[in-house]
């Protein structure tokens, strides 16, 4: 018996396909991209007029919520913009925010955007978790900021000793003058909204230029995939950090673009903090809910055991959306089952794919699929180029949502685009009728001594899924060797004995998919050494490089090596 699915208006999935003689494939939507504004503040002004009392931002304040309406946000953005103009900030001297998501951060962002001053949200990990502040110093050397904001000077004291620009910890909101209107009038499609940082395999920060055109065009692309936003303004309860494009562009943008409400969730998907998220979701019913796979996994025990939480969470929900990493199949299946048991119908569990350089949405799967690796197809306005690489396809992209390049790094910018102007994403896919299946990062893949290619991304995802919840993460080794090995970061409650007991059951279909040996890594991944990104994801190449001696031990007769029969 087929199950009913909650009725939600979703976009089309048809795609035009062109195949060239050189083996490359081009994909694009047959539907035209809808009109979009020159600057996102036009949407803020629209909603301040159309729904002035609607909540734009809310942040918990004890048992209540501190709120900012659309009318208040516009008024305060203009005042903040006046202050930033008085500080003589510019693209050469931008605003940086070192602390995380809060209402003050949001208003600084809006104020800077209103008067055309670029801002850069910096990962708090570079200030609070780092011990050498190397990435923070590198970012400041690249950007040369004119002003920095922190939510708490005491908490950020050590980091502030590393920087030289002016620092504020409270908003300054003078009365706006005609200078604000003049600056706003000069803002156009090519004006830089923000610099978002991403790290390559070297771990060196790159400042991705994000323009008004990129952000506005991408929001119209998202609306083409998820047109229900135009029928009902979205309500979000969101913890994801604004220094990442997923929340800072995708989520924040879809709220501003469509007149929604953004409830800032100060929880995180980790012990001791997930409870804050649960408390918020008991009170606020989202209509669109985004999380990373570990976030959904952390929520599951609470959704299983708390009927009141389940009822509120699923009551108004139109779409569940995951991104940022591979979603374990069991998490996908159980979230769908809980939704059905709670409200008698399935809720669309959708996903997409993008990058900091693409503002971010480049693919969207807005139809049901059993394979969680299916990232969907391009929305209107996006053109994809799929280039054969071994037995997968390297994806490249062109469209108004693509960055013009990396700030003050012309060599990296030139390397990022091919001869036809397509941005090189560096990700591997397979193209099937149901959509594009993500296979991992091409830079991580390697050959065994037999010449057989190992696709690391897919193998890592299968390994983590098979060994859940024992394994926190894994690094795949074996380049130039005869067999594949695994360097394992165990979860806090697991041990090597449990891992050994389950190694023999890991499924394989050949030498490139078979883990022949494994070793447990006792030292956690290092942020300062570039082994771990601020998102908590593992940099495969950095771990292999820094722990070369352990790679050698993995391929020795050491007693610590776990052999897979």
Where do the model's predicted regions map?
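Conserved AMP-binding/adenylate-forming core of the ANL superfamily
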Residues: 32, 56-110, 127-134, 186, ...
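Conserved pre-ATP/AMP-binding loop-to-beta segment of ANL
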Residues: 52-55, 176-197, 203-204, 228-235
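Conserved AMP-binding A3 loop
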Residues: 66-71, 193-220
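Conserved ATP-dependent adenylate/AMP-binding module captured primarily in the ANL superfamily
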Residues: 121, 125-150, 155-160, 176-177, ...
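Conserved AMP-binding/adenylation subdomain of ANL enzymes
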Residues: 216-235, 243-311
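Gly/Ser/Thr-rich phosphate-binding loop
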Residues: 258, 278, 287-290, 300-372, ...
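Conserved ATP-binding/catalytic segment of the ANL
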Residues: 393-448, 563-564
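Conserved C-terminal "lid"/linker of ANL adenylate-forming enzymes
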Residues: 446, 472-477, 506-565
């Amino acid at each position: 018996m087929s199950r009913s699915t909650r009725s939600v208006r979703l976009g089309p999935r048809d795609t035009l396909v062109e195949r060239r003689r050189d083996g490359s494939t081009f994909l694009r939507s047959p539907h035209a991209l809808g009109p979009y504004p020159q600057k996102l503040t036009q949407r803020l002004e629209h909603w301040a007029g159309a729904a002035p009392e609607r909540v734009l931002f809310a942040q918990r304040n004890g048992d209540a919520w501190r709120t900012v309406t659309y009318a208040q946000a516009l008024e305060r953005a203009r005042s903040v913009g006046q202050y930033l103009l008085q500080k003589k900030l510019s693209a050469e001297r931008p605003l940086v925010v070192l602390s995380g998501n809060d209402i003050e951060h949001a208003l600084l962002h809006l104020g800077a955007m209103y008067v055309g001053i670029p801002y850069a949200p910096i990962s708090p990990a570079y200030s609070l978790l780092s011990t050498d502040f190397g990435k923070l110093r590198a970012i400041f050397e690249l950007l040369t900021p004119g002003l920095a904001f922190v939510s708490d000077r005491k908490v950020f004291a050590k980091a502030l000793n590393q920087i030289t620009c002016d620092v504020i910890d409270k908003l300054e909101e003078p009365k706006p003058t005609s200078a604000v209107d003049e600056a706003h009038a000069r803002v156009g499609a090519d004006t830089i909204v923000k610099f978002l940082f991403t790290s390559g395999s070297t771990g060196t920060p790159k400042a991705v230029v994000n323009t008004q055109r990129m952000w506005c065009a991408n929001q119209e692309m998202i609306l083409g995939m998820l047109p229900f936003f135009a029928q009902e303004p979205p309500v979000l309860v969101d913890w994801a950090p604004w220094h990442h494009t997923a929340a800072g562009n995708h989520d924040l943008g879809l709220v501003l673009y469509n007149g929604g409400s953004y409830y800032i969730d100060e929880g995180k998907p980790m012990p001791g903090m997930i409870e804050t998220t649960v408390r918020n979701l008991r009170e606020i019913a989202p209509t669109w809910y985004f999380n990373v796979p570990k976030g959904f996994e952390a929520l599951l025990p609470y959704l299983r055991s708390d009927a009141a939480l389940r009822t509120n969470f699923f009551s108004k929900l139109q779409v569940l959306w995951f991104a940022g990493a591979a979603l374990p199949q069991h998490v996908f299946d159980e979230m769908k089952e809980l939704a059905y048991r709670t409200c008698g119908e399935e809720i669309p569990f959708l996903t997409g794919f993008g990058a900091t350089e693409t503002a971010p949405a480049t693919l969207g799967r807005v139809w049901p699929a059993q394979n969680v690796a299916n990232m969907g197809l391009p929305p209107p306005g996006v053109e994809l180029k799929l280039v054969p690489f071994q037995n997968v396809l390297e994806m490249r992209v062109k469209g108004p949502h693509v960055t013009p390049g990396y700030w003050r790094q012309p060599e990296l910018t030139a390397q990022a685009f091919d001869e036809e102007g397509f941005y090189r994403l560096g990700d591997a896919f397979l193209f099937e009728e149901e959509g594009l299946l993500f296979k991992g990062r091409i830079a991580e893949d390697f050959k065994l001594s037999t010449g057989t290619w190992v696709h690391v991304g897919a193998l890592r995802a299968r390994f983590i899924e098979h060994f859940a919840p024992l394994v926190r993460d894994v690094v795949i080794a074996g380049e130039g060797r005869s067999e594949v090995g695994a360097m394992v970061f165990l979860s806090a409650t697991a041990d090597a004995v449990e891992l050994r007991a389950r190694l023999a059951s890991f499924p394989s279909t050949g030498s490139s998919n078979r883990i022949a040996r494994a070793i447990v890594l006792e030292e956690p991944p290092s942020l300062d050494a570039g082994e771990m990104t601020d998102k908590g994801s593992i940099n495969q190449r950095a771990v292999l490089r820094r722990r070369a001696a352990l790679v050698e031990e993995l391929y020795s007769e050491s007693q610590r090596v776990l052999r897979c029969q």
